[in-house]
Amino acid sequence: VWKGKFSVGGEWTYTHRKDNYLNVENYVPSSNSKMNEMNITAFAEYSRSISIGDFILGARYEQIKFDYYKDDLHIDDQSRSYDNIYPNVSFSTRIGKVKTQISYTVKTQRPSYRLLSNSSLYIDRFSIQQGNPTLKSEITHNLNWIASWKFLQLSLGYQQTKNAIIYWGEPLNPNEYTILLKSINLNKSLPMLNAFISASPHIGIWESRLSLGITKQWLTIDSDGQQLKLNEPRFTGVLSNSFTLPENFLLSLDMQFRSKGDLRNVYFDRFNSYVDISLRKSFLNDALSIEVRGDDLFRQQKSKTLLRSGA
């Protein structure tokens, strides 16, 4: 079509969910709710090669009707309908020996039914976890650029997320020590920048992939009357090695690290790393294999997190 390729498609889904949570001890409130959701999706995409490169233009249309009932009564404030169009466009070309691509996409992420549930979960006498039927879908705008030369690759990405879903804690009642934990939508857009450089050399029996990157967000939240800036970046490094040995042996050595830093309203307060090693022997033209491996040899794959919220 028009010297290019045109594709269309669609899907339809209907979901009915019912939750009946009864707590006779009255540690947490009992609840009786149900949700009906109808989702109609259609998409179209056009791609074409021209003299200076290749481009793709597309769009995705979503119509969602969500009805929420509590004790068999329709709750208008928590029921909603969506009609949205999410475009995508990309262009790729070659400049000398460098391949490059730039793309822009808009995507949506619906909250899970577990997060939308109105039931409460008793954790201990100091904390109760609850769903949130009022959660909205996340909408993320992505702008990405990728360039590659031989075995080197550089990627830059910028994301702007509206209605980002975060885990939040606040007192269940005034002057009480019990904390209510639930997911909420941020009331502001969440910008995030990421940059990665990777190399994938292959020399003789050795094949390797090294990736180094940084992810940084810009977020300020109100926590217990104070403005907290959650802007500390996180650094990531991954090194994967494989050695093809005689007699169908394959030796692998993998390493990864993640630094401290912020991700939404969670602070990762520990440097995390691991080293894995494995030796595999294959038989019968790879139809049978035996592997011996050791994971996290130095026992450094540990995490320590801090939830920043209103509690």
What residue spans do the PLM features occupy?
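Transmembrane beta-strands of outer-membrane beta-barrel pores
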Residues: 12-18, 48-52, 61-67, 93-97, ...
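Membrane-embedded beta-strand positions of outer-membrane beta-barrel proteins
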Residues: 8-10, 57-59, 89, 102-104, ...
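Conserved C-terminal beta-signal and adjacent last beta-strands/turns
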Residues: 89, 230-311
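Outer-membrane beta-barrel translocator domains and adjoining extracellular loop/strand segments
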Residues: 18-27, 67-75, 113-121, 126-128, ...
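Outer membrane beta-barrel strand-and-loop segments of large Gram-negative receptors
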Residues: 136, 142, 153-212, 220-238
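Outer-membrane beta-barrel signature, preferentially recognizing the C-terminal barrel domain
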Residues: 34-37, 77-80, 108-162, 179-194, ...
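Residues on the lipid-exposed face of transmembrane beta-strands in outer-membrane beta-barrel proteins
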Residues: 1, 42-48, 89-93, 143-149, ...
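Face-selective signature of the C-terminal outer-membrane beta-barrel domain
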Residues: 1-71, 94-99, 152-155, 191-214
